[in-house]
């Protein structure tokens, strides 16, 4: 009997070699692959950052993709006006012009999800008229007392364009659209030699138990905080301040055994709304130890220190940026800085620096 390999053995050897080669390819790919986990409480701006990545690194949205945002934008706009009108009832704020009642009924007759390529003219007219009413404006000023989308004013101010028969969502319309994230969404994009896999997980409390599946081999965490929400309560629990919830969540993530060696990039987001709110809603009412009045720089420093001081690991670096997630120019600049940080962290983890 000869000493040559049987066909079966040859096939087995070929399979083993293929597996070895695949493992080598995987190891090489992992070195150039960045797994980034987006964390933060609900409505902190995580999904907006993902949309920015598409605009900055993937050539933006096609016409068909923009079309698909129409119904979301219509629904966000109508729902926001409905929320204000309901709040007017509970806060006992009357319409200045009672003739507006006809428009109120038009809004309440709309379904939760607006379908179709065009916003019905009577709905656009109702929103435009109601938004000019002083009673509606007064209720809007008190929006910290109820749950209103950040995008409400933007869509109301642009309602004539949004309600036009030939309306096509622009970048800003898309960035400000809101759909609650449930489960885990993954976005992949390439910057230079690196492939980024960015995971967005639902921020509401009920979604957090699902985060565990994203924890393994994460290169970095991008943690978002909506600092403008210092005077607001949670959607899920209206006894809890949103900023306090963000601090609690950041503490648990920053000091978790899962993330001892993971770099954390902290985006203190929604600085535009924060700056608007400070003179109107004193931060000291919600954080009694704050002494900076309505000084924007002092308020930013206070919030930054509240978060960074939670870090219990001397060797752990937290990189911080103040951001406006809907500002593409600023996010492009900030993400370039983040990319530099990640490259350095990657080289350190590989033992190359």
Swiss-Prot record:
Gene3D superfamilies: GI Alpha 1, domain 2-like (1.10.400.10), P-loop containing nucleotide triphosphate hydrolases (3.40.50.300). Residues 1-21 are annotated as: Disordered. Residues 7-21 have a biased composition (Basic and acidic residues). A lipid is attached at residue 2 (N-myristoyl glycine). It comes from the Eukaryota. A lipid is attached at residue 3 (S-palmitoyl cysteine). Residues 196-205 are annotated as: G3 motif. Keywords: GTP-binding, Hydrolase, Lipoprotein, Magnesium, Metal-binding, Myristate, Nucleotide-binding, Palmitate, Transducer. GTP binds at residues 43-48, 150, 175, 181, 203, 269-270, 272, 325. SUPFAM superfamilies: P-loop containing nucleoside triphosphate hydrolases, Transducin (alpha subunit), insertion domain. Residues 32-353 form the G-alpha domain. Residues 323-328 are annotated as: G5 motif. Residues 265-272 are annotated as: G4 motif. Residues 173-181 are annotated as: G2 motif. Coiled coil: none annotated. Mg(2+) binds at residues 47, 181. Residues 35-48 are annotated as: G1 motif. One of its GO terms (cellular component) is heterotrimeric G-protein complex. One of its GO terms (molecular function) is GTPase activity. GO terms for biological process: G protein-coupled receptor signaling pathway; pheromone-dependent signal transduction involved in conjugation with cellular fusion. Guanine nucleotide-binding proteins (G proteins) are involved as modulators or transducers in various transmembrane signaling systems. Plays a role in pathogenicity, specifically in appressorium formation in rice blast disease. Also involved in mating. G proteins are composed of 3 units; alpha, beta and gamma. The alpha chain contains the guanine nucleotide binding site. This is Guanine nucleotide-binding protein subunit alpha. It comes from Pyricularia oryzae (strain 70-15 / ATCC MYA-4617 / FGSC 8958).
């Amino acid at each position: 009997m000869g000493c040559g390999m049987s066909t079966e053995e040859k096939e087995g050897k070929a399979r083993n070699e293929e597996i070895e080669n695949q493992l080598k390819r995987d190891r090489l790919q992992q070195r150039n692959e960045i797994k980034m986990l987006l964390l933060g409480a609900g409505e902190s701006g995580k999904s907006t950052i993902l949309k920015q990545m598409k605009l900055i690194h993937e050539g933006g949205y096609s016409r068909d993709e923009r079309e698909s945002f129409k119904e979301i934008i219509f629904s966000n706009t109508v729902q926001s006006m409905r929320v204000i009108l309901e709040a007017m009832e509970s806060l006992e704020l009357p319409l200045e012009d009672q003739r507006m009642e006809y428009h109120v009924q038009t809004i309440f007759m709309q379904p939760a999800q607006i379908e179709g390529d065009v916003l019905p003219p009577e709905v656009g007219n109702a929103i435009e008229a109601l938004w000019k009413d002083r009673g509606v404006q007064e209720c809007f000023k008190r929006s910290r007392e109820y749950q209103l989308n950040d995008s409400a004013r933007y869509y109301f101010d642009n309602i004539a364009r949004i309600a036009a028969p030939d309306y096509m969502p622009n970048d800003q319309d898309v960035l400000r659209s809101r759909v609650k994230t449930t489960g885990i969404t993954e976005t992949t994009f390439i910057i230079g030699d690196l492939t980024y896999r960015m995971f967005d997980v639902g921020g509401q409390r009920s979604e957090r138990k699902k985060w565990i599946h994203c924890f393994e081999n994460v290169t970095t965490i991008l943690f978002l905080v909506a600092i403008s929400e210092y005077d607001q309560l949670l959607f899920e629990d209206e006894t809890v301040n949103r900023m306090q919830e963000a601090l609690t969540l950041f503490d648990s993530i920053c000091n978790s055994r899962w993330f001892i060696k993971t770099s954390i990039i902290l985006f203190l987001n929604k600085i535009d709304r924060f700056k608007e709110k400070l003179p109107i809603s004193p931060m000291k009412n919600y954080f009694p130890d704050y002494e900076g009045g309505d000084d924007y720089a002092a308020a930013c420093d206070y919030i930054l220190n509240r978060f960074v001081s939670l870090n219990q690991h001397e060797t752990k670096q937290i990189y911080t940026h103040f951001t406006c997630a809907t500002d593409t120019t600023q996010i492009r600049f900030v993400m370039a800085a983040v990319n530099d940080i990640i490259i350095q962290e990657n080289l350190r983890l590989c033992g190359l620096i």
